[in-house]
Amino acid sequence: GTEDVLAKYESAQEKNRESRTQLHLLKKEVLSKEAASILSEIIENNESNSLFSISRHYSLFSLDDLSTLAREIGPHIQKVAFLVHDPSHTVFLVSNGRIDCGKLVKENASIYNGKGGGNATLARAIFAKDEYVTTFIDLIEKHLR
């Protein structure tokens, strides 16, 4: 009867909660490993005195996940790191603030019909097409040389 349906519903809700918790913990772990990977790449580049900027592409993380990742690595980025969310053609520009990411987006995204904004340490630019993302990143990298 009704109690049976209610019990099944509560059981499904509990399984849902457990799955969401597990997903959250997995994402947190994977984001932490990705941050460590980016930071070790930064250390290698600093040791080789490379002027190279880091650019990584993602399709499984959400925009919120990339924002979290950006905040974690930001203080360690001397130049600019580009975190690209491929499904939405969104580029996060991340830095320690020495290079103003918000200003770079405001001054350059519109060249490729992009929109966006942000502050000195974190900004995002959203484009209509994937090729605009690549061209935008190339432009910013040349601008920073």
Where are these regions (language model features)?
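Terminal appendage regions of diverse proteins
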Residues: 1-145
